Design a protein with these regions (language model features):
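Conserved NTP phosphate-binding and transfer environment spanning the P-loop NTPase/kinase superfamily
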Residues: 1-164
């Protein structure tokens, strides 16, 4: 769905709008990112954790794989326990994933096979996403923080390993 802040974008397409701040940010986004990278160095392990979810992943029949609504609280439960150091995570291509046994799936029709599909990735799609992201970042030139370039390179390595 396209929101008022994103009226120049077609529904279903990705808009490069970091933190949904483009209409409101009064300075170069590369400087903005650099600020947050420096803040993380100063604050260390007290810096807020960032998690990404895709509530709308569909199976091969076009059905949503995650039930959504109130069951989204299960994801928040895992995030809180992860941030508190109560559960571990598995390193994956796009980040760190919950372990099946650490996630509250009581009452849901999600077995280990469905769980694996929830976290499966398409390396070719992610490689194309990296191409698009790097093209977007190219507009920032030398202002783009090196930490971002380094993370993109590491991400490309993980994608290549997933393809192998």
């Amino acid at each position: 769905e396209v929101t008022a802040a994103a009226t120049d974008v077609k529904a279903g397409s990705l808009r490069h709008d970091p933190f949904a701040m483009l209409p409101f940010c009064g300075y170069n986004m590369a400087d903005y990112w650099g600020h947050w990278i420096e803040m993380q160095k100063k604050v260390g392990d007290k810096f807020p954790k960032v998690y990404q979810v895709n509530w709308f992943r569909k199976d091969e029949d076009g059905n949503f794989m995650w039930p959504g609504y109130g069951d989204n609280a299960r994801v928040l439960d895992w995030i809180v326990r992860r941030a508190a150091g109560e559960v571990e995570a598995i390193d994956g291509v796009t980040g760190r994933y919950p372990k099946f046994e650490d996630f509250n799936l009581d009452g849901l029709d999600i077995d280990e096979a469905v769980w694996a599909k929830l976290f499966a990735i398409d390396p070719d799609a992610w490689a194309a996403e990296m191409d698009d992201t790097e093209e977007y970042f190219s507009q920032f030139g030398d202002k783009l923080p090196a930490a971002i370039t380094e993370q993109l390179a590491k991400f490309r390595e993980r994608i290549a390993a997933a393809k192998a």
